[in-house]
Amino acid sequence: TAGLVAALILKTRFPSKKIQIIRSEKIGIIGVGEGSTEHWNEFMNYIGLTFQDIIKNCDATFKSGIMFKNWHDKDYLHSIGPEHEIINGQYRTYYGKVISHDWSNKELNPLGTWENTVDEWHLDNDSPYNQFHFNTQKLNDYLHIIAEQKGINILDDEIKDVVLSDQGDISYIVGEKTNYASDFFIDCTGFKRLLINKLGAKWNSYSKYLKMKSAIVFPTEQKQEIDLWTTARAMDYGWMFTIPVWDRCGNGYIFDSDYITADQAQQEVEELLGKKINVGKHLKFDPGALDRVWINNCCAIGLSASFVEPLEATSIGTSINQTFLLMHRLPNYTKKSIDEYNKQIEIVLHNIRDFVALHYVTNKGHNEFWKDIKNVPLPGDLSDWLAHWKNNLPILEDFIHTGSYALFKDPHFIQILAGLELFNRDGLLSEYNMLSDANRKLADGIREERNVLGMNKVMIGHKDFLQRLRAKE
């Protein structure tokens, strides 16, 4: 996916440049299903796709966010959707009221989400959500077609070696069928990192902070109604994701192999589901990122550049933002271009690392694994921020240092902190009560507006909505 995303963005930005993809049909893709972040909409708009295209061609479903089950005393939904744009920058006032007054978690999420319903108005208008679940294979097949339509040459070959010039650049790559020379190379070879490793890139592990290192993936049948969210369920030794696409669900148990084996992980899942599962793959990984994702005339994107456990479905979003930044830095690039790019991407990846680590600041402690998780150190200055946020809602200014390409900022952190009940409600109430009467009334007005909209909208089930979309010409 990363290679196709990168090629499509770069071809759109540089239409006169020859771009080709080398991929091998013998090498499969990782994933039984895939989810996006809200950055997918920027990608679609940039290359000229519509949400109807994605729904029809990729067995896609809408994604409002991620439902966290069994991580805390109450389930909660991390949902950042277009509805927040309606609030015109005042969501913090509303969030402050919701959290400090202990309103339901549903009040933080778009209308109808918890009921798996969608406003019928969207059938002929804008997408109700800016995130999606995809059938990974169909997504790749569809992007392949779009890439060829845009003039990207896709060649079936397997990379065997990389040859460097005397100056240390990549001169050409050696394929099974022929050699390929180019001015610039994008390494999307996944965990193998065939190109960037040749240039001396080193792996910086996040395993000190993120303990998951194995996964089993497997499909299950689709439910009668299709969830509007990815489910992330805390398990005895990690967590399990469920990604609902049109005709089935893709699942994976992400676990710490220091505590259980893959067979034991499978047994735990089967006991939970009450049935046997067919495990497609057993994956092992070391969470982390390259020390430099851009070296000389090569940039690593996707799994070649980084891998943080898929708790917040960051893989596609990271590839998109990496490529958008690259397209600005690439023309007439200098050593300064490369250095600044690497600094910015390191910040992006640390933002993901810290956000994922936050999810494990939970009160779970029913077994040795979850007790040990409590003693895992927090990365960077996250512990200092948690102490600050205990009595203060996160604000955009807390994330200025992350730049415009970071995936997670104040609204995302607010929802996880609220879901894990890491706020001191009295502190937030004190902050809220310092607001003017007009601003406090605004928070009540937002709630009233939601209630009025809820009464007047025609809401239909997610599956029914998708069926109607798929049937439209």
Predicted regions: what they are:
Residues I9-G33:
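Glycine-rich FAD pyrophosphate-binding loop
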Residues I9, S127-E268, T323:
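Predominantly flavin-linked oxidoreductase catalytic cores and closely associated redox partners
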Residues M235-D286, S306-G317, R329-N332:
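Conserved FAD/dinucleotide-binding core of flavoprotein oxidoreductases
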Residues L8-K18, Q137, D141, H462-E473:
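Extreme N-terminal leader/targeting segments of oxidoreductases
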Residues F62, H328-E473:
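Long, low-complexity C-terminal extensions of enzymes
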Residues G288-R353:
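Conserved mid-domain beta->alpha element of the FAD-binding
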Residues V32-D119:
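Dinucleotide-binding Rossmann-like beta1-alpha1 core, especially the glycine-rich loop
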Residues G3-L4:
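N-terminal Rossmann-fold NAD(P) dinucleotide-binding loop
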